[in-house]
UniProtKB/Swiss-Prot annotation:
NCBIfam families: PRK05313.1. Homodimer. This is UPF0210 protein NMC1568. It comes from Neisseria meningitidis serogroup C / serotype 2a (strain ATCC 700532 / DSM 15464 / FAM18). Transmembrane segments: none annotated. Belongs to the UPF0210 family. InterPro entries: UPF0210. It holds the Pfam family DUF711.
Length: 451
């Protein structure tokens, strides 16, 4: 890869003035060779493999950050879904495995570890059910472990028994963790991807190599600055500006990923192009949409503006790298985006509008705080709606929702750090309890007739 001096100067400006960073270098680690019928042996095997494969990740990230002057905010680990790895143990709880993941991740100094996961889009094995029922206690007794459940796919349909259990699991987690914070580390997916470097939904897919490096970049501030400084008038020209900017962002991520791969002697997997916001001013996806001409994110036209942004980011990124993967789009996490927070506080950005926006962007209803008395079946209904959008449109969708115990609409909750804070948003008054309790499976959609 040849780098021009002009690109270097642009990168310096992106970092210094526009909040550009490499959000994460994530090592995916396969744990199939750790399987044992004895859960204590399994835990020791898991600890040994993670601490062996990942031991140099943090030092490498610090070296590359200093060498290139680009912040690398997080170093993370993702592992094979634990429901698959722990099944042979026949244990009635996998909380000890979560605690082992937590201990191993802390030992090597990473920010988060993902993969306390179950893939149940077509049905639940006994091990899958044990894992899902272990999630609340696992989130309570660990600090940096992230969990995910894949409840549907375009090919399998939606497993409504799993959707019901997921809603109950989130509700229980909210009740036993301070201000529901444990729920910030749980994602429920439809069409989950196997090479996602971002938390909380990262896991290492069964089709992946023994270890792989996946990189996530972040540059909402860079895109907004490019639009501010351009003379684009039509939306066609806006799309072109975004596309060219995404190309530049992606080139930096590609460089960091391939350098990390060489230093760690681990294959380079993918570069995730997702625009991932932070609560910092100037690092917001919502403000990009407003720069396009919306008075406030969430008003009419927001979904169209987001569709333009998402598509232009993908087009620009694909020209800059042959290893684009993961989720690759725009994230819209309410609590992690100061523009989204402001729009939600103003009452313009609602749960319904966010649901519509997820039909055209990366992932889905993300980091949304709802009243603590929200029933489990309502959470399951929200998950089912989001999964349906993903299933029908052949895309990844997800829900990361936090029922905040003791809080109601109008209150707010502080999560801190990259997770930010969120206003508590209202949910519908009507009940979907009978619908959710029916269980079964929503069949996979027909593919030949698309309307």
């Amino acid at each position: 890869m040849s780098i021009q001096s002009g690109e270097i100067l642009e990168t310096v400006k992106m970092v210094a003035d526009q909040n550009f960073d490499v959000r994460t270098i994530t090592i995916g680690i396969d744990l199939h060779d750790c399987i044992s019928t004895d859960i204590d042996v399994l835990n020791q095997n898991i600890y040994n493999k993670i601490t062996t494969v990942g031991k140099d990740l943090v030092a490498t990230a610090k070296y590359l950050s200093a060498k290139y002057g680009v912040p690398i905010v997080n170093q993370r680990i993702s592992v094979t879904p634990i429901a698959q790895i722990a099944a042979a143990s026949k244990a009635d709880s996998y909380v000890s495995v979560a605690q082992t993941l937590d201990k191993a991740a802390k030992a090597i100094g990473v920010s988060f570890i993902g993969g306390f996961s179950a893939l149940v889009q077509k049905g639940m094995s006994p091990s899958d059910e044990v894992l899902i029922r272990s999630i609340p206690e696992a989130m309570k007794t660990t600090d940096i472990v992230c969990s995910s459940i894949n409840v549907g796919s375009t090919r399998a349909g939606i497993n409504m028994d799993a959707v019901k259990l997921a809603g109950e699991t989130i509700k229980r987690t909210a009740e036993i963790t301070p201000e529901g914070f444990g729920c910030a580390k749980i994602v429920v997916f439809c069409n989950a991807v196997e090479d996602n470097p971002f938390m909380a939904g990262a896991f290492h897919g069964s089709g992946e190599a023994d270890a792989v490096i996946n990189v996530g970049v972040s540059g909402p501030g860079v895109v907004k600055a490019a639009l501010e400084n351009s003379d684009a008038t039509t939306l066609t020209e806006v799309a072109e500006v975004v596309k060219k900017t995404a190309f530049k962002i992606t080139r930096v991520g590609e460089l960091i990923g391939r350098e990390a791969s060489k230093m760690l002697n681990i294959p380079f997997g993918i570069l995730d192009l997702s625009l991932a916001p932070t609560p910092a001013v100037g690092d917001s996806v919502a403000r990009i949409l407003e720069e396009m001409g919306l008075s406030v994110c969430g008003t009419h036209g927001t979904t169209a503006a987001l569709a333009l942004l998402n598509d232009a980011v993908k087009k620009g990124g694909m020209m800059a790298s042959s290893a684009v993967g993961g989720l690759s789009g725009a994230f819209i996490p309410v609590s992690e985006d100061e523009g989204m927070i402001a729009a939600a506080e103003a009452g313009v950005l609602t749960l319904d509008k966010l649901e519509a926006m997820t039909a055209v962007c990366s992932v889905g209803l993300d980091m949304i705080a709802v009243p603590g008395d929200t029933p489990a079946h309502t959470i399951s209904g929200i998950i089912a709606d989001e999964a349906a959008i993903g299933m029908i449109n052949s895309k990844t969708t997800a829900v990361r929702i936090i029922p905040v115990t003791g809080k109601t609409v109008g209150d707010s909750v502080e999560f801190g750090g990259l997770l930010g804070y969120a206003p508590v948003m209202p949910v519908k008054e009507g009940s979907c309890e009978v619908f959710v309790n029916r269980g079964g499976r929503i069949p996979a959609p027909v593919q030949s007739m698309k309307n």
